[in-house]
Amino acid sequence: MAIWRIINRSYLKYASNQLTRNYYTQVCLASSTHVVKQTTKLSSFDIPNSDICTRPSNIFQNLRFLATSAQTRKKEAEVDSDGPRLNEKITGDYVRLVSEEGHCVVSLREALRRAKELQCDLVEVQRDAKPPVCKIVKYSLELYKKAKVGKERAKAKRAEAIRPDIKEIRFTPKIEAKDLKFKSDQALKLMESGYRVKCLAVPDKDKHKELEPEKLLELLFRFTCFIGDALVESWPEADRKGAVVIVRHAKFGPPKKGGVKLMKDIDIKSARVKEESPKPDSSKAGVATVDDQEDIEKSEPRFSVEQAQPVKFQNAYAKREPSSEFSGGRDASRFEPQSPNQHVNPQRPRFSNQAPNQQPTGRFDPQSPNQPPSAPRPQFPNQQPTGRFDPQFPSQPPRPQFPNQAPNQQSTGRFNPQFPNQRPSPPQSRFPDQAPNQQPSGPSPNRHPDRQGPPPRFQNQAPNQQPTGRFEPQPPNPPRAPPRPQTRLPNETSNEQPTAPGRSSGPASGYGIFSTPKTK
């Protein structure tokens, strides 16, 4: 009976728990369909015999674990492929430690302790072994040694191949034996490095002359005696500008083209000498050589002083007729010599007022004294003649310049006012030996008697007026009489104030309209 009661109680509790769980799930679904916001919190404390929290779902965890296993393996492989693992990156409880004394199996912790004491790294040498093999070394030093070995291998491999570049060594005949030996050592080093060497013998630059090819070849073979074991790649050649040969080291093998030939086996006579291009014949070009000049001097006839004749040159203009441009000009006589009995045609005048046979000379052409003077043209509209007058002809009297001037009076360059009661002063003579009223007997001594003054250059200019270049004042109207002093009548009173005995009669000092009179 007791057992039955226990079973009924447990069954009733289980049934009640199932009913309450179904009820809550239906309420949640109904609230979601009607879009009603209700917060229902189900807790395991409210449902003591609930199995929701006690049953973990491992299905999704197992699926995630299966998906990431392949990815983790790839990452580990990438890390391991970079290089050996060091120190703490080594996995495993035990390792086989290799040293100079031998090898033994120790724990990983013991191997790390030993590496730390020696200040080195614990490097995993073989990972696939069980247990993995490790070694205590300095990892940075091992990397340096490995890189150095790689460089040496690359250098040795490069030294086995010939380089395409060509190095050149040049020397001149004035080089000494020790310098020639030094250059040969340089050539050997270059050939061992894989270069082909071009040996060039050239003449001295300071002498500026070319040597014979045989001398340059002799100098070249003196140099090649120091490198006799070298292979000849290009056969020796020589000319007046230099001798050249190209050699290479024997360890690189013979060249592809041509046979094997050592430098020491080559004879100097077998070298090729370039022929010079023929020079143009100097006799055909019109240039005489030294031998030709000697022959000319020997064959040249020698004349005595009596037989000497002047050298005649051919006149290129003897048979040429002058053009019409020079037929009537002043240069016609330069091209056509005329005999004294030959009739001369009148020349065409170059100007409108020129005589038929008159030669134009320059700016001023003198005229004969019997020719009448041309009409004067004033320079300016209101211009009067200047004070200086040079008579053109002896019989022509000068004209007065001013209305009150005497006929024979000479005007000066300045104005002298005269008063009515003053006597007119006699005119001053221009020359020291001339009387006051004496007329000049001839033209000015500075002028030629047969020459006439130049024609006026301006429209209103007088015939003999000289333009001065500066303005000269003209005389105004008749001068006024000087002012007479004022006379004061005896009964006339003055408006002046009497001055004090101690004061002067001058104007009183003040400051104009702003000054105030002083009151006593």
UniProtKB/Swiss-Prot annotation:
Pfam families for the chain: IF3_N
Listed SUPFAM superfamilies: Translation initiation factor IF3, C-terminal domain (SSF55200), Translation initiation factor IF3, N-terminal domain (SSF54364)
Show the GO MF annotations.
translation initiation factor activity
The UniProt keyword set, sorted, is: Initiation factor, Mitochondrion, Protein biosynthesis, Transit peptide
Q: Any one cellular component term from GO for this entry?
A: mitochondrion
* Transit peptide residue numbers: 1-66
Region annotation (Disordered) ranges: 271-520
| InterPro entries according to UniProt | T_IF-3_C_sf, T_IF-3_N_sf, Translation_initiation_fac_3, Translation_initiation_fac_3_N
Q: Does the keyword Nucleus apply?
A: no
Q: Give its localization.
A: Mitochondrion
Major location (coarse): mitochondrion
Basic and acidic residues composition bias: which ranges? 271-282
Biased segments, Polar residues type? 336-361, 404-422, 458-468
Pro residues bias spans: 369-379, 473-485
Quote the subunit structure annotation.
Answer: Monomer.
Function of the protein? IF-3 binds to the 30S ribosomal subunit and shifts the equilibrium between 70S ribosomes and their 50S and 30S subunits in favor of the free subunits, thus enhancing the availability of 30S subunits on which protein synthesis initiation begins.
Record's family?
Belongs to the IF-3 family.
Protein's name in the database? Translation initiation factor IF3-1, mitochondrial
Species per Swiss-Prot/TrEMBL record:
Arabidopsis thaliana (Mouse-ear cress)
Q: Which gene encodes it?
A: IF3-1
